[in-house]
Amino acid sequence: MAAAAATMSKNRPNAAILGYPVTGSDVKGCCATAPDTISCVDKNTCPCFIFATRTDAVVPVMNSIRFMEALVQADISFESHIYSYGPHGFSTCDTSVQSGDTTISSRVPNWVSDSIGWLKEVFGDFGNGGMTKPVCKAHVTDNDGEFLSVDCTFGYVMGKPEGWKVVEGFLGGAGKQEKLEGQEAPQMTLEMISMASGMKLRQILEYAHMPEEVIEQVNDQLSMIPNQR
């Protein structure tokens, strides 16, 4: 149900914690009309915290893995913990729900404190009369943002003529050597460009030894370009 709320509901939660979830077609074994939530993951899916065990004999761990793959494809932030062994339905692993002789990794209970820490990263923490600023954004990159930025992927900006023109103005064009602050920027071959296409532009510029203040200048110019999708 949590996975369905995160991927399908009209009013979606701001974050979801999914424990050994049934997310794929296996759910049909429980209810013939139940949805396959993996296929419903989209850009509006909220950040997710997922935990499971490798040896779950009731819900195959591939439910969690394929759901995470869908989150990656949709650029959604998530944290996951797949522990080495343990039964299905371990809950918090407290003695009220698990007997002392249950065969389960001693680290499984960590998901409780880890998920709380993750929620603080997503929502912010309590401090000085208010909430601190979240450090984990809903999307890993800015590819779906209203405007371009250096936190879009390198390949995405390359595909936007206006955006790439800005970057070229600072780098001097891919494949050329250029000095920045007395240092030579590394030459980018086609192979390197292909490999780097999924990296954030910010990371590429840092790799090229571009000073932070110059990176911010690039970002300022990109932020004036609407992200036409």
Annotate each predicted stretch with a short phrase.
Residues 54-57, 85-87:
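Acidic beta-to-alpha connecting loop that harbors the catalytic carboxylate
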Residues 44, 49-52, 56:
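Short beta-strand/loop motif that positions the catalytic acidic residue
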Residues 17-20, 51, 83-84:
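Alpha/beta-hydrolase-fold catalytic nucleophile elbow
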Residues 57-66:
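Conserved alpha/beta-hydrolase "acid-adjacent" motif
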Residues 72-141:
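C-terminal catalytic histidine-bearing segment of alpha/beta-hydrolase fold enzymes
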Residues 144-228:
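Compact, charge-rich alpha-helical regulatory domains located at protein termini
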Residues 12-15, 45-47, 74-79:
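Loop/turn elements at helix/coil->beta-strand transitions in domains of secreted/extracellular proteins
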Residues 1-43:
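Primarily recognizes the serine-hydrolase "nucleophile elbow" in alpha/beta-hydrolase
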